[in-house]
């Protein structure tokens, strides 16, 4: 290598396998009988690349049955996107001539304060301000990496664009420029620099040192594709060293000159001071960033030599020709019309399409499972979709294949991170039931001894809390704890969580973190910090707490959860050790330089791979172009290069789903190009077997019989149950519902923090009316609204419900008072009275909302309704028999010693009618009514229905058929239990489509 004139730059073609081909060439060139490769220094892009090269050395020696050899020294440049630092070679200890880098968390908090000052009254809440500060820091880093000086923001190229921008862009660039100037002034005062600036300084110092005093030992830069100006200069210096070389992955040396020129100038303007990125540059091409790198290194593509070695698992050579043809720029792609078969050949590449993301994950897992049946075969799943990666990991667990996602898991999705965030949410939403139960039932809480007793208490109060959310914080749940029999346990919980109950005003973020970490540790103990996610959380808390205290960052309680979640999303928790030795799951950054026999590229849809280009929130695209900073479309080219590299594997599966979580998905532009390149032969590359096999995994063996309409026939001793006054119409209209409720004793469970149901609203209204009637017995002038207010307070009715329902309820209650006062011929003699009777050996029981007695001694049965009451026709058809049964109990039984003949039956509704809340309806045909039952027929008709029900179901042997009367307007709480959707089509056919 040292005999070459000019810069020593090499490229390894995609099909050769970069890591293995690199090692295959390094060993014979630099291997030493005595020292092995110890004198060689490899400069690599990331820590992941270092591990990949180490594994390649191990494979090389194992394949060639060679004895062990000393490994080369591996130095890491560090990938900013992976938040990696420079290795010791470039950033040695004691480098006092280079200022230290500012802590990134401190920078975040200080930038937020600077933005608040600059924006004044227009400043958003702190959570949004920190988000903007994070974006500001990212934009500053982009400029620093590209060597854009701060004063260039007011240079002629930028000023020339300002007048053409919208007002918000002009405002944002002014704010950004002022914040950057003030920030740099602060750094200068403290003797610090930004991390990106420090990297540039270290690159420049290393380059200068090696040029002035060239190292005696060889230095090879391998796999570096970043085109940052200072890094490009360092790579050129390495290429010029006598014992140096630069080895670039996947540079297309086969692309003809016309196509190469069509990519654009790539940093080489025709005139001094011209734009770095011209408008015609094809930034989305996978070779563009490599052309930019070569131009910044001052190296012509013709000077780059082919690395004439290949890896252990190299793909067919024609694969590189196909990849080159695949990504030809627009004008050059015209040659596809006459492209010969060799340059279209993609043998070993399969295309797989699934119906949705879940099926795609299952299909990918099946491919992995199939592949590892072959000894020594390595599989890599590459996808930028972390949700898809997590699903693949879960599907592989069915075969006990532990596959770690090397891209890591965001801290906020780990068990430790979730616990801290759930505690933060408690203070943000005033201890809402869902958040409270989620925090108390978290897997880390009381994980060891005592976990069972703890969960039993949590489940007890969980059941008691079902229904609409109360207001009042922790104190609102005391009566639920008492009802559930866990009052003592709840007192202990309240003491632990009490520090989170605050008035909502801003407080020190450091103090918040002290409180949250103390409570989390009190609940979970040392288990909170025991695993890698706990250690990452500990580092996060310490870093955030220290810098927040120094800067004085304050945050309101309702923003705490958002601020912590946004920050934790930026932290990836990677597994400390690998899973299956031949299975790996990578993100795009982690996949670079990796190698496998089978590479599965998942999530090949627009918006995922490539991602949707996002505009810089602070600097308009025209401003970035004027500054010579690549726009968001540059990343499309990088993702295209990642796909091109993946296509170099011996076997490749390109996978997508027709639908994603948001709806129908558009195939990736890269996938469409592949299909177009394959032309008529695309069908030969379709993967059909795996996609067909996937659905069979979860299908029961053999044929599955249709589920019949349920018709349970319990024995007589189980049938003999009492009948509620609200259950008779259910027994006749939908016997299965009666069977489930009264014989199986199954009840629907309300959700936590549920929307107010009519039943809940009815209970509240009944309580108010009961207390008002009782108060009127003591004081005829008692007012109903103060009583209603007191009931609302006792029940801790949530403020939102008070605002939405209370005005309508109170209007109806006031009208009820008027209606009661107008009935001067009646007297209320019973409120919420329980009653029962025996009828043909069956107990019939219920509660009367109100019973009045008229001047003739006859009774009026009143039933309160929060909504629309049953119609007279429904009562006549047997769909609403409650009033009639209450009348029968009053006649043949009693309501706590109250009995008599009932002649009036009324529904008092709180709903709106004729523009007014509160009205009375009767199912009887009285007055001017033209429909309804004759008064003398009300009780005989009801008794007839009761006799029929007792004869057929309670004392008889009729099956409790589901939906016996399809016209019965009952509830649907048992529809899932009866598996209605599985047989309702059959029901519709039987009833002529009336179901």
Over which residues does each language-model region extend?
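Polyanion-engaging groove/track-forming segments
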Residues: 1-779, 789-795, 799-802, 969-974, ...
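RecB-family 4Fe-4S metal-dependent nuclease core
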Residues: 514, 528, 662, 703-995
